[in-house]
Amino acid sequence: MEAAMRRYAELGVHTLKTGYAGGFKGGYLHHSQYGVQHYQRVVETVAKYRIMLDVHKPIKETGIRRTWPNMMTREGARGMEWNAWSEGNSAEYLTTQPFVRMLSGPMDYTPGIFDIDYSTAKADKGRIEWNGPNAECCIKTTLARQIANWVIIYSPLQMAADLIENYEGHPAFRFFRDFDADCDWSKALQGEIGDYIVVARRAKDRHFLGAGTDEKARTLVQKLDFLEPGVTYTATIYADAPDAGRNPEAYLIGKRAVTARDTIRIEMAERGGQAITFIPAEK
Protein backbone atom coordinates (compact mmCIF):
# COMPACT_ATOMS: atom_id res chain seq x y z
CA MET A 1 0.00 0.00 0.00
CA GLU A 2 2.78 2.41 0.91
CA ALA A 3 4.48 2.02 -2.47
CA ALA A 4 1.18 2.40 -4.33
CA MET A 5 0.28 5.62 -2.51
CA ARG A 6 3.74 7.01 -3.08
CA ARG A 7 3.38 6.32 -6.79
CA TYR A 8 -0.08 7.93 -6.89
CA ALA A 9 1.37 11.05 -5.28
CA GLU A 10 4.19 11.14 -7.84
CA LEU A 11 1.59 11.00 -10.61
CA GLY A 12 -0.33 13.90 -9.08
CA VAL A 13 -3.28 11.85 -7.85
CA HIS A 14 -5.07 13.75 -5.08
CA THR A 15 -8.25 11.71 -4.62
CA LEU A 16 -8.75 7.98 -4.15
CA LYS A 17 -12.07 6.14 -4.21
CA THR A 18 -11.85 2.72 -2.59
CA GLY A 19 -14.36 -0.13 -2.66
CA TYR A 20 -14.68 -3.52 -1.03
CA ALA A 21 -17.57 -5.17 -2.87
CA GLY A 22 -15.52 -8.37 -3.11
CA GLY A 23 -14.83 -8.45 0.62
CA PHE A 24 -11.51 -9.14 2.36
CA LYS A 25 -9.26 -12.11 1.80
CA GLY A 26 -9.77 -14.75 4.43
CA GLY A 27 -13.45 -13.95 4.73
CA TYR A 28 -13.00 -11.15 7.25
CA LEU A 29 -16.00 -8.87 7.73
CA HIS A 30 -15.79 -5.12 7.30
CA HIS A 31 -16.37 -4.49 10.99
CA SER A 32 -14.01 -7.21 12.20
CA GLN A 33 -10.85 -6.22 14.03
CA TYR A 34 -8.93 -6.95 10.84
CA GLY A 35 -11.27 -4.75 8.80
CA VAL A 36 -11.23 -1.82 11.22
CA GLN A 37 -7.44 -1.88 11.46
CA HIS A 38 -7.20 -2.01 7.67
CA TYR A 39 -9.42 1.06 7.25
CA GLN A 40 -7.39 2.96 9.83
CA ARG A 41 -4.15 2.06 8.06
CA VAL A 42 -5.54 3.23 4.72
CA VAL A 43 -6.63 6.60 6.12
CA GLU A 44 -3.27 7.23 7.79
CA THR A 45 -1.21 6.06 4.82
CA VAL A 46 -2.97 8.18 2.20
CA ALA A 47 -2.80 11.19 4.54
CA LYS A 48 1.01 11.00 4.40
CA TYR A 49 0.75 11.62 0.67
CA ARG A 50 -1.98 14.27 0.91
CA ILE A 51 -4.55 12.09 -0.80
CA MET A 52 -8.27 12.50 -0.15
CA LEU A 53 -10.44 9.42 0.48
CA ASP A 54 -13.91 8.49 -0.73
CA VAL A 55 -14.69 5.08 0.75
CA HIS A 56 -17.36 2.72 -0.51
CA LYS A 57 -18.31 -0.31 1.60
CA PRO A 58 -16.86 1.47 4.67
CA ILE A 59 -17.13 0.75 8.33
CA LYS A 60 -19.55 2.91 10.31
CA GLU A 61 -18.74 6.55 10.89
CA THR A 62 -16.77 7.00 14.10
CA GLY A 63 -15.73 10.64 13.89
CA ILE A 64 -12.41 9.68 12.31
CA ARG A 65 -12.77 12.45 9.74
CA ARG A 66 -12.25 15.03 12.49
CA THR A 67 -8.83 13.56 13.25
CA TRP A 68 -8.04 12.69 9.65
CA PRO A 69 -9.82 15.28 7.47
CA ASN A 70 -8.59 13.56 4.31
CA MET A 71 -11.37 11.03 5.07
CA MET A 72 -13.67 13.20 2.98
CA THR A 73 -16.79 11.11 2.39
CA ARG A 74 -18.10 7.58 2.40
CA GLU A 75 -21.00 5.54 1.12
CA GLY A 76 -22.20 3.53 4.13
CA ALA A 77 -25.72 2.97 2.84
CA ARG A 78 -27.57 1.23 0.04
CA GLY A 79 -26.12 3.27 -2.80
CA MET A 80 -27.28 4.27 -6.25
CA GLU A 81 -25.89 1.15 -7.90
CA TRP A 82 -28.61 -0.98 -6.30
CA ASN A 83 -31.04 0.47 -8.82
CA ALA A 84 -29.13 -1.38 -11.54
CA TRP A 85 -29.77 -4.96 -10.48
CA SER A 86 -32.52 -5.07 -7.86
CA GLU A 87 -35.86 -3.56 -6.93
CA GLY A 88 -33.84 -0.43 -6.28
CA ASN A 89 -34.06 2.36 -3.72
CA SER A 90 -37.47 3.92 -3.27
CA ALA A 91 -38.17 7.63 -3.04
CA GLU A 92 -39.23 6.98 0.56
CA TYR A 93 -35.80 5.53 1.27
CA LEU A 94 -34.23 8.74 -0.02
CA THR A 95 -36.43 10.87 2.26
CA THR A 96 -35.43 8.68 5.22
CA GLN A 97 -31.64 8.69 4.93
CA PRO A 98 -31.21 12.43 5.65
CA PHE A 99 -32.76 11.80 9.07
CA VAL A 100 -30.86 8.58 9.78
CA ARG A 101 -27.62 7.71 7.98
CA MET A 102 -26.63 11.31 7.32
CA LEU A 103 -26.63 12.21 11.00
CA SER A 104 -23.26 10.44 11.16
CA GLY A 105 -21.61 12.42 8.39
CA PRO A 106 -21.25 12.91 4.62
CA MET A 107 -22.71 10.25 2.34
CA ASP A 108 -21.47 9.46 -1.16
CA TYR A 109 -24.66 8.16 -2.73
CA THR A 110 -23.55 9.11 -6.29
CA PRO A 111 -26.81 10.83 -7.26
CA GLY A 112 -27.44 12.64 -10.52
CA ILE A 113 -28.50 9.90 -12.95
CA PHE A 114 -30.29 11.26 -16.04
CA ASP A 115 -30.99 7.96 -17.85
CA ILE A 116 -33.88 7.22 -15.49
CA ASP A 117 -35.34 4.25 -17.36
CA TYR A 118 -31.93 2.95 -18.50
CA SER A 119 -32.88 3.38 -22.14
CA THR A 120 -29.18 3.68 -22.96
CA ALA A 121 -28.44 0.51 -21.02
CA LYS A 122 -31.27 -1.38 -22.69
CA ALA A 123 -29.77 -0.61 -26.07
CA ASP A 124 -26.47 -2.16 -24.99
CA LYS A 125 -26.78 -5.95 -24.98
CA GLY A 126 -23.70 -6.22 -22.84
CA ARG A 127 -25.56 -4.59 -19.93
CA ILE A 128 -28.63 -6.83 -19.86
CA GLU A 129 -27.03 -9.27 -17.44
CA TRP A 130 -26.82 -6.79 -14.59
CA ASN A 131 -29.99 -4.96 -15.56
CA GLY A 132 -32.31 -7.95 -15.08
CA PRO A 133 -33.37 -10.53 -17.69
CA ASN A 134 -35.73 -8.07 -19.34
CA ALA A 135 -33.79 -4.92 -18.50
CA GLU A 136 -36.63 -3.89 -16.19
CA CYS A 137 -34.57 -2.07 -13.56
CA CYS A 138 -34.75 1.72 -13.36
CA ILE A 139 -34.19 4.72 -11.12
CA LYS A 140 -37.12 5.19 -8.74
CA THR A 141 -37.19 9.00 -8.84
CA THR A 142 -37.65 11.79 -11.36
CA LEU A 143 -34.75 13.51 -13.08
CA ALA A 144 -35.38 16.70 -11.10
CA ARG A 145 -35.11 14.69 -7.88
CA GLN A 146 -31.79 13.26 -9.03
CA ILE A 147 -30.49 16.81 -9.27
CA ALA A 148 -32.03 17.78 -5.92
CA ASN A 149 -30.26 14.87 -4.25
CA TRP A 150 -26.96 16.65 -4.85
CA VAL A 151 -28.13 19.18 -2.28
CA ILE A 152 -30.15 16.88 -0.02
CA ILE A 153 -27.53 14.15 0.34
CA TYR A 154 -24.50 16.09 1.54
CA SER A 155 -21.04 15.09 0.39
CA PRO A 156 -18.15 17.55 0.02
CA LEU A 157 -17.03 15.43 -2.95
CA GLN A 158 -19.80 14.75 -5.46
CA MET A 159 -19.73 12.50 -8.50
CA ALA A 160 -21.93 12.81 -11.57
CA ALA A 161 -22.22 9.04 -11.93
CA ASP A 162 -24.11 8.59 -15.20
CA LEU A 163 -22.55 7.86 -18.59
CA ILE A 164 -20.99 10.87 -20.30
CA GLU A 165 -23.30 10.50 -23.29
CA ASN A 166 -26.32 10.95 -21.00
CA TYR A 167 -24.98 14.34 -19.85
CA GLU A 168 -23.51 15.63 -23.08
CA GLY A 169 -25.53 18.60 -24.29
CA HIS A 170 -28.19 18.12 -21.60
CA PRO A 171 -29.54 21.50 -20.38
CA ALA A 172 -30.00 20.23 -16.81
CA PHE A 173 -26.28 19.48 -16.52
CA ARG A 174 -25.89 23.22 -15.92
CA PHE A 175 -26.79 22.58 -12.28
CA PHE A 176 -23.68 20.47 -11.73
CA ARG A 177 -21.51 23.19 -13.24
CA ASP A 178 -23.01 25.83 -10.95
CA PHE A 179 -23.04 23.68 -7.80
CA ASP A 180 -20.26 23.92 -5.22
CA ALA A 181 -20.04 20.86 -3.00
CA ASP A 182 -17.70 22.62 -0.56
CA CYS A 183 -20.57 24.00 1.50
CA ASP A 184 -19.86 26.06 4.61
CA TRP A 185 -23.44 26.29 5.91
CA SER A 186 -26.42 23.92 5.83
CA LYS A 187 -29.94 23.94 7.22
CA ALA A 188 -32.86 21.52 7.10
CA LEU A 189 -35.79 23.83 6.34
CA GLN A 190 -38.68 21.40 6.64
CA GLY A 191 -39.48 17.71 6.40
CA GLU A 192 -41.00 14.54 7.81
CA ILE A 193 -39.06 11.28 8.06
CA GLY A 194 -39.81 9.13 5.03
CA ASP A 195 -42.21 11.69 3.54
CA TYR A 196 -40.37 14.79 2.32
CA ILE A 197 -37.33 16.95 2.95
CA VAL A 198 -36.17 20.47 2.06
CA VAL A 199 -32.54 21.44 2.62
CA ALA A 200 -30.60 24.66 1.96
CA ARG A 201 -26.82 24.94 1.71
CA ARG A 202 -24.37 27.75 1.08
CA ALA A 203 -20.94 27.78 -0.53
CA LYS A 204 -19.25 31.20 -0.53
CA ASP A 205 -21.82 33.61 -2.00
CA ARG A 206 -24.00 30.95 -3.61
CA HIS A 207 -26.97 29.18 -2.06
CA PHE A 208 -28.60 25.93 -3.09
CA LEU A 209 -31.93 24.34 -2.25
CA GLY A 210 -32.92 20.71 -2.66
CA ALA A 211 -36.38 19.28 -2.04
CA GLY A 212 -37.66 15.74 -2.40
CA THR A 213 -40.81 13.76 -1.75
CA ASP A 214 -41.72 10.11 -1.39
CA GLU A 215 -44.21 8.31 -3.63
CA LYS A 216 -46.75 11.08 -3.01
CA ALA A 217 -46.91 14.29 -5.06
CA ARG A 218 -46.59 17.39 -2.87
CA THR A 219 -46.66 21.16 -3.01
CA LEU A 220 -44.69 22.97 -0.32
CA VAL A 221 -44.38 26.65 0.52
CA GLN A 222 -40.89 27.80 1.46
CA LYS A 223 -39.60 31.15 2.70
CA LEU A 224 -36.24 32.25 1.31
CA ASP A 225 -35.16 34.00 4.50
CA PHE A 226 -31.97 31.90 4.56
CA LEU A 227 -30.61 34.09 1.74
CA GLU A 228 -28.39 37.08 2.46
CA PRO A 229 -30.57 40.14 3.24
CA GLY A 230 -30.36 42.95 0.73
CA VAL A 231 -28.97 40.77 -2.07
CA THR A 232 -30.87 40.00 -5.26
CA TYR A 233 -30.28 36.49 -6.57
CA THR A 234 -30.96 34.81 -9.88
CA ALA A 235 -32.78 31.62 -8.95
CA THR A 236 -32.46 28.84 -11.52
CA ILE A 237 -35.14 26.26 -10.79
CA TYR A 238 -34.93 22.62 -11.90
CA ALA A 239 -38.43 21.25 -11.39
CA ASP A 240 -40.65 18.31 -12.25
CA ALA A 241 -42.70 18.83 -15.40
CA PRO A 242 -46.49 18.44 -14.99
CA ASP A 243 -46.31 14.91 -16.44
CA ALA A 244 -43.21 13.82 -14.49
CA GLY A 245 -45.25 11.33 -12.49
CA ARG A 246 -45.74 9.30 -15.68
CA ASN A 247 -42.59 10.45 -17.47
CA PRO A 248 -39.86 10.83 -14.82
CA GLU A 249 -37.35 12.32 -17.24
CA ALA A 250 -39.66 15.29 -17.90
CA TYR A 251 -38.38 18.45 -16.26
CA LEU A 252 -38.61 22.23 -16.44
CA ILE A 253 -35.92 24.88 -16.01
CA GLY A 254 -37.00 28.37 -15.00
CA LYS A 255 -35.36 31.55 -13.78
CA ARG A 256 -36.52 34.41 -11.60
CA ALA A 257 -35.08 37.17 -9.46
CA VAL A 258 -35.54 36.63 -5.72
CA THR A 259 -34.50 38.10 -2.38
CA ALA A 260 -34.62 36.94 1.22
CA ARG A 261 -38.09 38.49 1.50
CA ASP A 262 -39.63 36.14 -1.08
CA THR A 263 -41.57 32.90 -0.71
CA ILE A 264 -41.68 30.13 -3.31
CA ARG A 265 -43.94 27.18 -4.08
CA ILE A 266 -42.19 23.86 -4.53
CA GLU A 267 -44.32 21.57 -6.67
CA MET A 268 -43.14 17.97 -6.81
CA ALA A 269 -44.48 14.98 -8.70
CA GLU A 270 -44.68 11.60 -7.02
CA ARG A 271 -41.08 10.42 -6.41
CA GLY A 272 -40.08 13.90 -7.49
CA GLY A 273 -38.11 16.86 -6.31
CA GLN A 274 -36.79 20.30 -7.07
CA ALA A 275 -33.34 21.88 -7.08
CA ILE A 276 -32.56 25.59 -7.10
CA THR A 277 -29.33 27.53 -7.44
CA PHE A 278 -29.27 31.06 -6.02
CA ILE A 279 -26.46 33.10 -7.58
CA PRO A 280 -26.04 36.82 -6.79
CA ALA A 281 -27.31 38.84 -9.74
CA GLU A 282 -24.79 40.95 -11.58
CA LYS A 283 -25.15 44.63 -10.77
Task: Identify the residue ranges that each predicted region occupies.
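Generic beta-strand/beta-sheet core signal
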Residues: 16-21, 54-56, 210-214, 238, ...
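Solvent-exposed beta-strand/loop surfaces of large extracellular or lumenal domains
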Residues: 237-261
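C-terminal beta-strand-rich structural cap/linker in extracellular carbohydrate-active enzymes
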Residues: 255-283
